[in-house]
């Protein structure tokens, strides 16, 4: 069932020769047939003048239904005639590629309609009332992304060569057709704020462009798009899962089964209906992270920016809570600036709110210092670290949208009624209100006294830890001297004789009297050293006897042992 759109067994040379050999008389008729009525899904059926920047791209429907399609279009690029009626049971062939005749087909229709249709401005939407949600969906599918998606390298190079061949298309009209695409899409993206109603918004995370054609229920008569909404907000956490939005590779892969596609289409449409936002819609930079939104290099931006955030919040979002998801583009950049400017020059009633944001930033920096390895310990009672550490820890674990949500509510004073993630937006403001007037006006002056006290405290603690080590080391260096001083403390002469010129500090030196002489020494020196050793022993024995006598001990017993 799915093998036919992805069959690579066709011959590129035969296909190219068939395309080149088409005569000029039937070129305009055959080119239009390569696009069945599926192409009208993505563009509104209104007029197009020579001013291409202000109009929508048009494909005439009369030619598409009258001329029979050639054989190569039926094989690969086209649907059978009864395919639009059974769109839910067959894969869309339009999702795979766009033949280069599409550009020349648009070129021909541009030339034909520019001479007949009057100019018409785009100040008001011109789609019929039955199709309110078709334009936001079509903004996600660019012609470049459709042309680039799921094409083998050989076929892509062949189409590139065909599209720029001078024998097939006229250069000036081809360039005008390309400019019509780009300017029409740019102008349509600029007017998104005015063309959509309040309930007609982008979903919270736009899907890749290859899934969008599979997930829309488009009627076969090309007159209206009927999208059914369930309106049940409790099913959103079952509907919105990131398995729908898997990044598409650049090579052809088999499509999933039609039952899964129909379920995913219902889930995605239910989610986009129930999670409408009231703030201004995102700009073109938010919708298209790169010029080719379905390239595999840019698919990571969908997952990192849009698909990473919904897991942190509960799905039952109210209309006023969703300002954190799509904040206005002009309000994102200067959010950091008013916190310091308004703290310096602002009336007193506004100071608590601005200071809470300032203290929240300060708490984040303090917690980063504590967690970063410096280990500067501060007194919890002096700074209320129980409040600031909890708030900073929860803010670091939250997504960046949580901080933007908090800053949004801080500056705009929006009364919020959070259902599930109350602590995500109010974890800093109620706890820090008592200290709102305490810090000074400059942020560094506010941070310096407490950090200075903490650093001074840590320095004194380190100094106290180092001093016992120095005392112990000095005592270890001077261990033999007190022992010798005790031994010779009986007489002052003995204390003087302790200082010897040669000292060999080993384990048992305190118990030895060094009397040896070097082998090269003279006999007189050896005799003198022996005499000094005898005198030293005598003085030591006398000092010991005097100490025992002063203590009241038995001197006779000691003399009997010593002598």
Swiss-Prot record:
Residues 272-305 have a biased composition (Low complexity). Signal peptide: none annotated. One of its GO terms (biological process) is conidium formation. Disulfide bonds: none annotated. The keyword Transcription applies. Keywords: Activator, Conidiation, Sporulation, Transcription, Transcription regulation. Belongs to the wetA family. The lineage of its organism: Eukaryota, Fungi, Dikarya, Ascomycota, Pezizomycotina. BrlA, abaA and wetA are pivotal regulators of conidiophore development and conidium maturation. They act individually and together to regulate their own expression and that of numerous other sporulation-specific genes. Residues 54-81, 112-176, 272-318, 334-356, 430-494, 516-538 are annotated as: Disordered. This is Developmental regulatory protein wetA. The gene is wetA. Induction: Expression is controlled by abaA. It comes from Aspergillus oryzae (strain ATCC 42149 / RIB 40). Disruption phenotype: Loses conidial pigments and exhibits autolytic phenotype. The keyword Transcription applies.
């Amino acid at each position: 069932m799915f093998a036919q759109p992805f069959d690579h067994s066709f011959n590129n040379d035969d296909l190219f020769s068939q395309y080149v050999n088409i005569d000029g008389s039937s070129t305009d008729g055959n080119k239009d047939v390569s696009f069945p009525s599926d192409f009208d899904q993505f563009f509104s059926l209104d007029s197009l003048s020579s001013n291409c920047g202000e109009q929508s791209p048009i494909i005439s429907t009369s030619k598409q239904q009258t001329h029979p399609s050639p054989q190569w279009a039926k094989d690969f690029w086209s649907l059978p005639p009864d395919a639009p009626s059974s769109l839910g049971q067959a894969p869309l062939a339009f999702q795979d590629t766009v033949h280069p005749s599409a550009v020349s087909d648009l070129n021909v229709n541009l030339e034909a309609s520019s001479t007949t249709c009057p100019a018409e401005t785009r100040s008001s939407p011109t789609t019929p009332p039955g199709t309110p949600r078709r334009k936001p969906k079509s903004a996600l599918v660019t012609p470049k992304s459709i042309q680039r998606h799921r094409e083998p390298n050989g076929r892509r190079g062949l189409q590139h060569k065909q599209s720029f061949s001078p024998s097939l298309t006229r250069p000036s009209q081809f360039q005008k057709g390309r400019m019509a695409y780009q300017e029409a899409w740019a102008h349509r993206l600029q007017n998104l704020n005015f063309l959509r109603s309040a309930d007609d918004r982008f979903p919270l995370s736009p899907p890749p462009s290859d899934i969008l054609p599979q997930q829309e229920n488009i009627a076969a008569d090309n007159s209206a798009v009927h999208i059914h909404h369930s309106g049940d907000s409790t099913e959103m956490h079952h509907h919105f899962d990131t398995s729908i939005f898997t990044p598409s590779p650049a090579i052809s892969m088999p499509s999933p089964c039609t039952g899964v596609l129909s379920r995913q289409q219902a889930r995605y449409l239910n989610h986009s209906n129930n999670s409408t936002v009231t703030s201004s819609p995102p700009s073109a930079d938010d919708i298209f992270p790169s010029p080719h939104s379905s390239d595999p290099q840019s698919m990571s931006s969908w997952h990192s920016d849009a698909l990473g955030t919904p897991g942190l919040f509960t799905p039952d979002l109210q209309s006023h809570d969703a300002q954190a998801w799509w904040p206005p583009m002009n309000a994102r950049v200067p959010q950091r600036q008013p916190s310091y400017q308004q703290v310096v020059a602002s009336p007193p009633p506004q100071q608590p709110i601005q200071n809470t944001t300032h203290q929240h930033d300060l708490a984040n920096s303090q917690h980063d210092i504590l967690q970063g390895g410096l280990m500067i310990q501060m007194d919890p009672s002096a700074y209320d670290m129980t409040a600031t550490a909890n708030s900073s820890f929860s803010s670091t674990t939250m997504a960046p949208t949580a901080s933007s949500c908090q800053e949004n509510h801080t500056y705009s004073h929006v009364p919020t009624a959070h259902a599930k993630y109350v602590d995500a937006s109010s974890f800093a403001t109620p706890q820090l209100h008592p200290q709102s007037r305490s810090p000074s006006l400059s942020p560094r002056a506010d941070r310096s006294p407490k950090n200075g006290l903490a650093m001074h405290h840590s320095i004194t603690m380190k100094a106290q830890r180092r001093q016992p080590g120095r005392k112990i080391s000095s005592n270890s260096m001077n261990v033999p001297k007190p022992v010798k001083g005790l031994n010779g403390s009986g007489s002052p002469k003995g204390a003087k004789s302790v200082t010897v010129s040669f000292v060999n500090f080993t384990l048992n030196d305190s118990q030895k009297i060094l009397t040896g002489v070097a082998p090269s020494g003279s006999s007189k020196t050896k005799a003198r050293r022996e005499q000094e050793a005898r005198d030293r022993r005598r003085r030591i024995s006398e000092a010991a006897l005097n100490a025992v006598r002063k203590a009241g001990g038995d001197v006779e017993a000691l003399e009997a042992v010593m002598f």
